[in-house]
Amino acid sequence: MRSIRQWVAVLALALPAAFLAPAGPSTAAPTAANADAVTSPTARLHLGAADLPETRTVTQLAPGVTQTSITRGGPDSSLFWTAEVAIPSSSPDPDAPASALSDQTHAQFVAARLRAAGVQARVEHVQSPQLADAGGDLGYRVRAGQFGTKADGTDTVSLITAAGYSSSVLYTGWDGDSASTDQSRGPWKLEVVTIDPKQFSGELTSSFGADIENPETTSQLAGQSGALAATNGGFFVLDPKAGAPGDPAGAAVYQGRVLSEAVGDRPSLVIDGKKNQSSVQRLTWYGSISRQGDQGQNQLALNGTDRVPGLIRNCGNDADDTPTALPLHDVTCTDANETVAFTPEFGSSTPSGPGLEVVLDSKDTVTAVNSVRGISVPKGGRTLQAIGSGVDKLRAVAQVGTTLKITTELINEQGTPLKTKPSTNVVNGGPLLLSGGVENITAKRDGMVHPNDGNSFYYGWVHKRNPRTIAGVDAQGRTLLVTADGRQTTALGLSIKETADVAQSLGMVDALNLDGGGSTTMAINGQVVNTPSDATGQRPVGDALLVLPRRKD
């Protein structure tokens, strides 16, 4: 077994401001036990108060691959548990949902009613850090009580419920309020894997496991491949009502094969495994079906690949989708008239139901036309499913014996198709965090601002601290994969603004947010090294980023 070299660098409790956030990476000094210098990320994180203690443990996993474990800050006696009230909507729409936030007048009205019921409620103004296209004044929240433990808030929640409101108990350390984040004391726990393409002789890649429709844990995916290191990857379908669980909810390419369409033009991590290099790119989808040799005549739109027709997780597909054609995170858009392609990678059987399913061989020649959906995809071939008005359109071009031309492409920002080869992998993400070394957090563009919800989704997903997974590239061309634990009193997590700050502190010049929350996981040599936030432990995920000790080609 490969020997592991390790050392700990304990940083001073306070440093002059000029040394807190150097622009580029630094090199950790080797100890006597380790004569070979191992490159580590930059010396300190721009996270919380400037005087926080920070400890780093750097482990060399292989030549050109390091793991850096970072702890920053410590227990903060000013933090506590509190009850947060779901404020009923002031909209005339009787179906309008309650929200964590409201305008000041309505929040004060709710607080007054609670105080009349014996609840010591308070109103707090929520100011969020300004991002490239979102943030600022989010509204007002209503909270009650200060508790030493979550369980201590039970009686207050009961009083709030009796007064006719819903509430939950949460930890104030998870707030991302702009007035307090730069004075936060932590604690934070992060893991960083750095891959240097100039030294690493293995392969950076991604994998969904045995098939797309059955998610697996990050450590399972790492173990199957013998990965040195792995993190969870992109967003994916969790709920069967939103599609096939495990299906990437955004662009995905595995070993050069395009197996999921993009969400609008959200950013993705594009990996060249042959060179062990990666880049952050905005990609859009283009799909079409026509008869071979028709030169564009009778061309049909192909709406996607390897997902349930009619269900578009995170939206951002086309103008016919409801409620929007734009990206809308954690929302499932619908379209009753779609055509979707399926590959053998999808799973044991394609989605069943009414519609049409066309079976193609390895040369895309039609071998069967079925009047219902749901079959096994032939080895080396694929199928096309149509629903709604797509049925007659597909039937018109796909007769048995006809050879079709099927295009499935991801288009880059230059308007040209992404060139793929067997070493190409793409993992979806969002929002964008950094561009050219500058923070450029495009939360609204990438679908994290929900219309007409009183900023409630933004408040919980962007503004508040959560577990996060980050991927990016530094000025030296190294790829960095980062996890930050959260939803714990011993690890607060990061707001999206703090996520970008951390990426920049680590020397990244281009970076994006990957799937986080309960999905955030890092495994080293098959063993989980962070603390996933789900009560059940590791969450099965759609795909994972893998650092393999040897090349597959």
Where are these regions (language model features)?
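Gly/Ser/Thr/Pro-rich low-complexity, intrinsically disordered segments
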Residues: 2-7, 16-19, 23-553
